[in-house]
Amino acid sequence: MGKNRRKQKVIPPPLLPPDVAEEDIEFSDEDLKYVKENTDYAQFVSQIDTAAINKQCGGRVMTVEDKYEEERSKRKTLQEEKGNGEILVDPVDVLPVKTLDGKLHYRTESKKSKLAEAETDEAEKDVLEDEHVLNKSQRREKAKKSKREAKKHEKDLPDEILQEEEETPQAAVLAEVKEELSAEESFENKKNKIAELGMLLLSDPEANIKTLKDMLDICKDQNTKIVKLALLSLLAVFKDIIPGYRIRLPTEKELEMKISKEVKKTRFYESTLLKAYKSYLQKLIIFEKQSVYNQIANRCLCTLLEAVPHFNYRDNLLIAVVRNISSPDEVVRRLCCSTIRYLFSNEGKHGGELTVQAVRLIADHVKAHNCQLHPNAIEVFMSIRFDEDIGKPNKEDEHNKKYKKNNKRKTQEEQNQVQENERKKSKKDMMSKIRDEVSADHRGVTYEPDAKERRKMQTETLSAVFETYFRILRNTMYTIGERTEEIPTSNPGAFGSHPLLAPCLDGLAKFTQQLDLDYMGDLMNYLKKLASSSSSVSNNTKQKNSKLLTVSERLRCCLVAFKVMRSNLNALNVDLQDFFVQLYNLILEYRPGRDSGVILAESLKIMLCDDRHQDMQKAAAFVKRLATFALCFGCAESMSALVTLKTLLQKNVKCRNLLENDAGGGSVSGSIAKYQPYATDPNLSGALATVLWELSLLSKHYHPAISTMATTVSNMNTSQSQTFLSAVTPQQAFADFSLVKESFEPKNESRKLNNKRKRESLPEEAKNVPEIDMVKLSKKLKENFTILRDIKEDERVRMELLQSEEKKPLKKQNNVVKKKLKNPKSKKQI
């Protein structure tokens, strides 16, 4: 108890002297003199902190009476500020408070509610507590109270937090569902709006032509599905409401003229339709460059060009379609190519004008991309149709001319007789002029050109087509070059090194009938150079240079040369010996997985089977080369080679001496007495001096058709006539025996027989074979396996010993180092 009492005793600080302002303080002369003399002693005065001294002095502990008086004064000031908002409490209910002066003070209450009163009391207490300076004990009590309140608050929190956590995901899910529902509703509303606008336009386009603007505004939506639906619906609307003629907007003079209401209505309809169609095309061209709308935009452009090729802005449509004719996207490329083919085959819709424009655009496209396009870009030319008898006059025109001449004679006779006929003549002239004007207007609307105009357009298209073909040939010759070593190796393009050469050669073979004979010589020289481009090049340079022509492309060049000669009825004086030499060398360079067998079979048919006049030495060389070729490759290649070999032997009777082994071929060899298998020229091979020994091997082929064909060829006699030619061509043989159509299954010689038949059919050698002792056989196998196991174990032990021997010196070195580190003497010696 004594200790507690001692702690409760508080020693008040001494009273401070009265505050005096610095201005009122007076200093004597002696004080100033003393300070000047002893400045060192007066320096501490400058370092005194008056604020800290005042704080320490003001931090004395207040008594209970002082606190009470201070609180009462503050409450009094608050009551005075509130004014008349308080009422006096009954003195019976509440005891008064007596101050030191002896005055009684009764309690008053405000007119507010109890909650407001509690809030004000708490606020007042907080203000008072903040203003008072607390002791350490009071601070501790306050901290303890705050901790207790915090603990109570923590106990109450978890339930509320769990409720909030449960409520938040539900709210988020509900918000997401609402958003999805709103998005679906907006999507359905927009779809219905598009359908309504489209139905209005289709039902009455003249009255509802303004709704096209609303449909075009829907194309600006952020939803891609809505934009696609709007584009497709606009496509259907434009296909239906576009007229069958080209719209011509009125000029300034025509606008100044007075017109009827119907004409105004049609003009307004046509102008709004043209504006909407133009803006629609602009949107399609913009969407075409975006990957999301690429296919939809190209589909709309292609369908519009097919449906309304006569309408306005067809040039813009054609440019957009030709631009994507070699697109890397296969769907877009097929759409554009099919549209161009449709335009070429249906010239009645546009009068042939779009064909000329399309061919020119394709030619410029090929030139701009340096002939590095997809083959489909040139294959569309195969759909063009050229009229051969376009310049010949019709019978009706001749009949009309004769009728006009007779009429002229009659009119001249009548003029001399009657003067009144002059008036009739003037009327007839006026009628003829009017008819000519009407026919001219009709031509301008229907786009039906005359024979001269049509012939002119077709000559322009033909010149553009052959211009592209010759450009491709020159480009391939430039890339290959006269010496391939001069050209640096470079990677081929996305579509190959020469993607346009194959369709170019096919087009030349088809359209050479329309080509002038003056250009035939240049064409044959180009083909000859291309066919012999890789013949003088070594294998190393062929592998390094990827721009050399393949075997299939060189065979195509030979084929086109023969087709050009056939189409012109052999009117050209061109030697085809070089092409035979290339075919003779290309037969051995052929590889089935790399090259096309169809082209090889076609070249064998056209160059060897269909050729009427052949040299005996050359025919024998091809017979020998084809027999060697049949041994090296599959069924389809060997069958087509045997069919060609048979036709050559049937046509050339002297070449059948190759089938006779007794003759030896020496007497029929001619100038060359020995066969040269590595000769590049068939005329210098000396094939008549050899024998077809390959047929004896082919007669034992696993395929029965090839073996039978080889036996029939080997059994041919020299006395057989040439009338019994084979009905099967090399192309048919290759197609029938290719892997795709071949259904051949080699027969299994093992027959399913009964046990009795097996015993009876066994030969005597099989019966005399002794039975095998399985026990001895198993012992031998076990010994063999044990030997192998021992060998593996020995190898493993050897490897372990070697590793252990390598580790021993390392361990010794480590031990020596450790000893030296432990002994300090050894360190000094080191």
Curated annotation (Swiss-Prot):
Family matches, as Pfam families: CBF, NOC3p
Region named Disordered: 1-22, 67-86, 112-169, 391-436, 802-830
Compositionally biased tracts (Basic and acidic residues): 67-84, 130-140, 391-400, 420-436
InterPro entries, per the entry: ARM-type_fold, CCAAT-binding_factor, Noc3_N, Nucleolar_cplx-assoc_3
Bias type Acidic residues, positions: 118-129, 159-168
Coiled coil residues, start to end: 61-81, 111-156, 400-429
Primary localisation category: nucleus
Protein family (similarity comment): Belongs to the CBF/MAK21 family.
Quaternary structure annotation from Swiss-Prot or TrEMBL: Component of nucleolar complexes. Interacts with RBL and NOC2 in both the nucleolus and nucleoplasm.
The protein's name in its UniProt record: Nucleolar complex-associated protein 3
